[in-house]
Amino acid sequence: MQKIFFIADTHFGHNNILNFSNRPFCSIEEHDECLIDNINAHVGKTDILYHLGDFCWGDTAKKQIDFAKELINKINCKYIHLVLGNHDPRTNSGQPKEDFIKLFNSCSPYMVVRIPNTPSVADIGHTKKKKTVLCHYALRTWEGMHGGSQGGNGSLGGDYGTNLPSGL
C-alpha cells in the first residue's frame, strides 16, 4: 500500500544549518548522508513524499539545481512533491527556477491535497480523504480549517490548529 510522508527544511548542503538549528553532525556531508539514509529507510519507491520547502543549498542557482538533481537521484522515492521554501532557487522576479521545479512531480508555494484514511471524529466508520493544506510557512488560518481540514508547514512551526508534524 502506498504511504504518504512529510519532511521539511532538509537544507542539504547548507553548512550553516548545522549551527543555526543545532543539528548534531560533524560535517554537512554527514548530515546529508544521514537524512538521505533516513528517507530511504522509511519511504518506499512508490510512496509519496511531500517536502515542505528548503530542499537544498547552493552558492548559485545553477549549483543548487545541479545539487538537487544529484540528491533526488539518491532518494529511492520516485514521487516527490515540493512546496517551495524561502531557500529554494528563484528568478530575480521571485518565480521558482524552471529547471528546479522540473525535478519534482509537482512544485508550488502552496498545495491542497487529499490524504486518505486520516482519522477525525467525522471520519469514524468511513474511508474519507482529509483535505490537507501544505505551505512552507506556518499559516494562522488555512482553507477549510473550520471544516476539519488539517495544515502542514515547515519552517515556522506553531500551534495554530491541527498541524501535521513533518519529519522522518
Question: How should each PLM-predicted stretch be described?
Answer:
Residues 1-2, 129:
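A structure-centric signal for secondary-structure junctions around beta-strands
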Residues 2-7, 12-117:
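Core catalytic region of metal-dependent phosphoesterases/phosphodiesterases
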Residues 98-168:
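Conserved beta-sheet core of the metallophosphoesterase superfamily
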